[in-house]
Regions:
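Walker A/P-loop nucleotide-binding motif
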Residues: 41-59
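Short glycine-rich substrate-engagement loop in P-loop NTPases that contacts/grips substrate
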Residues: 66-100, 110-116
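Short conserved motifs of the RecA-like P-loop NTPase core
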Residues: 185-197
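Short regulatory helix/loop adjacent to the ATP-binding pocket of P-loop NTPases
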Residues: 141-156
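A short, basic N-terminal segment
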Residues: 1-35, 40, 217-234
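The conserved phosphate-sensing helix
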Residues: 198-212
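Conserved P-loop NTPase "ATPase switch" module shared by AAA+ and STAND
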Residues: 94-118, 122, 129-138
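Conserved AAA+ ATPase "SRH/arginine-finger" region at the nucleotide-binding site
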Residues: 158-170
């Protein structure tokens, strides 16, 4: 087993990253993306947005939905941020035999010369085999540093959606929505405190909530303001 195979085996989906746990207010691009990605008839889609808009969550949710609906056929989630320094051919080899492939954080490799032809060829193999291919990045295809025109053409060949940054009110509801899923009650006061003291980024906020969940479960404590301040040291 080579280094890449060892790493790929170690990649685990976050079991909290499901469609049920994805906060997507009706009428927002997040809601549209959720509906689009749940539709397994869409063979290729490209979703972009800034950090914290839910891209990785959505990709993992699609894989987990696929796993619960089908008894056979593989769903593959590749976080390119972790895999970008491995040989592209090695990373993408044979994946077109899967039912579903999710490439997360394409920005990490889009401007690399050694990834251009392998990505283009992989697109073609997926198209020929009917493999569903989903891609995320932080910007629309035209703004990526893609070096191969044919690859850019492939990236633009399907539906592209751009997610929006969550507003403070959305982040508060997102925190409370996720807390409820963990069996926790998060008051408006505590949620606002977290937004005031922590970066307004869903990744950071969810990590804080998971830490609070672990300690509150262990100590059988409610999420009061003093408790939250102590646990997070803020």
């Amino acid at each position: 087993v080579n280094d890449f195979q060892q790493l790929s085996l170690a990649i685990k989906l976050d079991n909290q990253a499901t469609f049920d746990n994805f906060y997507a207010p009706t009428g927002t691009p997040q809601h549209l993306a959720k509906m689009l990605l749940q539709d397994e008839g869409k063979q290729y889609a490209y979703v972009c947005g800034s950090s914290g808009t839910g891209l990785s969550h959505l990709m993992q949710a699609v894989c987990q939905q696929h796993g619960t609906r089908l008894s056979n056929g593989a769903a593959v989630y590749l976080p390119l941020k972790e895999l970008c320094d491995y040989p592209a051919d090695q990373v993408l080899e044979g994946l077109e035999s899967s039912d579903l492939v999710c490439l997360d954080d394409l920005d990490q490799v889009a401007g690399r010369e050694e990834w251009q032809a392998p990505l283009f060829n992989f697109f073609n193999r997926c198209s020929e085999s009917g493999t569903r291919l989903l891609i995320t990045a932080h910007t629309l295809p035209d703004y990526l540093e893609v070096l191969l025109d044919d690859l850019l053409s492939r990236l633009k060949s399907g539906i592209s959606l751009q997610l929006i940054d969550y507003k403070d009110a959305d982040l508060r509801r997102l925190l409370q929505h996720r807390a409820s899923g963990l069996g926790l009650y998060l008051s408006d006061e505590v949620a606002r405190f977290l937004l005031h003291r922590l970066p307004r980024n869903s990744h950071v906020l969810m990590e804080a909530l998971e830490k609070l969940d672990g300690v509150s479960l262990r100590e059988q404590r409610r999420l009061t303001l003093p408790f939250v301040k102590t646990v997070l040291d803020i």
